[in-house]
Amino acid sequence: MSLALLFCVLLSFLSFSCSSTSIPKNGSVIIPEDFFGVVHAGHTKSVEEYGLLDELGVEWILTTFYWSNIEGQKGVFDFSEYDDYVDTARKNNKKVIAVLAYTVDWIFPEGKRKRYISPENIPYFLNFIGETVRHYRGRIDAFSIWNEPNFVFWDGSDKDFFELSRLTAQRIRETDPDAYILGGAFWRSPGGFIKRMYKAGAMENIDALAFHPYAVNPEGSMKVYDKFLRVLSEINYHAPVWITEVGYPTGGWYPTRVSREKLPSHVIKTITGAAARGASTLLWYALTDTYNEGEVPNTNDSELFFGLAYPDFSRKNGAWAYELCARYLPGSRYAPEFPQKENMPSNIVSFCFMDGISGVNTLIIWNDRNRSQKVNLRLSSPALLHDISSGQNRSLPGEASLDIGKEPLFITWEGTDVPLLFIQ
């Protein structure tokens, strides 16, 4: 079964479309200043690509450091491909997450390569880990162990993966005690898998857990996030949570597909929900589509359509929504006590982020129902209403009547004024 088909089948059973937004119950949180990142970025090493990354407010970039690309021949290590990648990222002030993963032909002398490392071959993988971590000590900002082992990227038993993960984290820590280690990289929130991994001791040396809350829409994605937090609470495990992949393709046949027109709304809602739940980092999957518009050879393949932009670095409109969030949310405090409300129905969803590093406050509002609703906003400070699809903005009066629909409104203002939402 192809990856695309398997992805669709699994999501058809596991995902669900939620009609209402779940509001986080964790209280006030501070959004990290380096919250924002993207996957599959930095490979062209071009001025144009890094220019777009800067415009978007990207702090982190992630790529896979394939074992086969580094030690294609047993005992012969070639880091040249990744040296250039890392050096360019550091020169451009981007932090790098290196995913250490997958296999080499020479451990499968009698058969086709699989995404599995048997116990007798683990020492070879650990040697690759040690050499790579030693080579990049002080130059890589985080190491992530494998990718989605509970999905299609691990062909062995859970038990064998837990041992591989445990020993890999141990080897990284021994090689570089200061390394930041991400474990898990789970696809969605596999409760039983996580609990067994914890019981096997595979989380002992890691600094944070990574996961990928893919779902058919942002509401479903946040349900996945809430389940993930419940699982961690059940095992009494406390560590930062990193979202190292989340996104929605604008083409193909994945059930997560969204139109380009609705992508900005999905971007805003997903980022807002994750930030308010206390995620340490969020990396959007991905920076660019595989092909420029009109050049796609297979329009059924959703994997080709996940970008915020195109390979020529022209933007989809979802990129403007990402940039808005990256400009105003870092350093702010998610303030669940705001905005103040009078006679507000529960279908009007609002998230307030106060005192960002730019000295600006942000109010994001949308309606869970399909029809729009008139709501009044009162602020004594001047405010701006931003278009999430274009980056343009317009001024709002001190008291404004707003049409609240399914597409979020993104409002910013300076000062200490507290917003009031009310219906007359």
Regions found by a protein language model. Name each.
Residues 254-327, 337-345:
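Aromatic/acidic polysaccharide-binding cleft in carbohydrate-active enzymes
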Residues 396-424:
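C-terminal beta-strand-rich structural cap/linker in extracellular carbohydrate-active enzymes
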Residues 4-15:
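Bacterial N-terminal signal peptides
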Residues 34-40, 61-63, 96-100, 141-145, ...:
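Hydrophobic faces of well-ordered beta-strands that scaffold small-molecule active sites
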Residues 73-74, 108-234, 252-269, 298-301, ...:
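Active-site cleft segment of glycoside hydrolase catalytic domains centered on the general acid/base Glu
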Residues 21-131, 137, 144:
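N-terminal substrate-binding region of glycoside hydrolase catalytic domains
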Residues 341-382, 388-391:
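Carbohydrate-binding surface patches
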